[in-house]
């Protein structure tokens, strides 16, 4: 991926994160283990996955490397199956990504 394309992806991800935080009503703290924070992070990570690499997502989520992102992707099904709050956050995350992508003319492929 070219440097220019990478910068576009990171800008898009940052815009999505800001809009998502506005919609859910709080800032995501990257070090917090509170369930509400974890579910919010996992939801947005899974929603933006089709739009970039694991490293791009890690950068925008203030993580050191992609391993946390891989863990979040793997935990999606469990959260989705057992947490109504997570399902609501994931729906908001998907809508945020879709709306932001349409507004900015971004295609996931």
Where do the model's predicted regions map?
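Short, Lys/Arg-enriched N-terminal segment that forms or immediately precedes the first helix
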Residues: 19-34
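Short Lys/Arg-enriched helix C-cap and helix-to-coil transition segments
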Residues: 80-103
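General nucleic-acid-binding
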Residues: 1-15, 96-99, 106-109
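Residue-level marker of regulatory loop/turn positions in helix-turn-helix DNA-binding domains and
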Residues: 5, 34-38
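Short alpha-helical "recognition helix" segments of helix-turn-helix
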Residues: 56-61
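Short, amphipathic alpha-helical "recognition" segments used to contact nucleic acids or chromatin
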Residues: 37-52
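Helix-turn-helix DNA-binding helix
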Residues: 65-69
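DNA major-groove recognition helix of helix-turn-helix
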Residues: 49, 72-73, 80
């Amino acid at each position: 991926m070219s440097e220019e394309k990478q910068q576009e992806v990171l800008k898009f991800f940052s815009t999505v994160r800001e809009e998502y935080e506005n919609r859910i009503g709080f800032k995501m703290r990257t070090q917090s283990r509170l369930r509400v924070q974890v579910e919010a992070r996992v939801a947005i990570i899974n929603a933006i996955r089709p739009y970039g690499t694991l490293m791009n997502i890690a950068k925008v989520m203030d993580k050191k490397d992609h391993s946390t992102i891989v863990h979040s992707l793997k935990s999606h099904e469990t959260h989705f199956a057992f947490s109504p709050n997570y399902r609501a956050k994931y729906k908001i995350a998907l809508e945020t990504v879709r709306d932001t992508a349409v507004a900015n003319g971004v295609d996931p492929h």
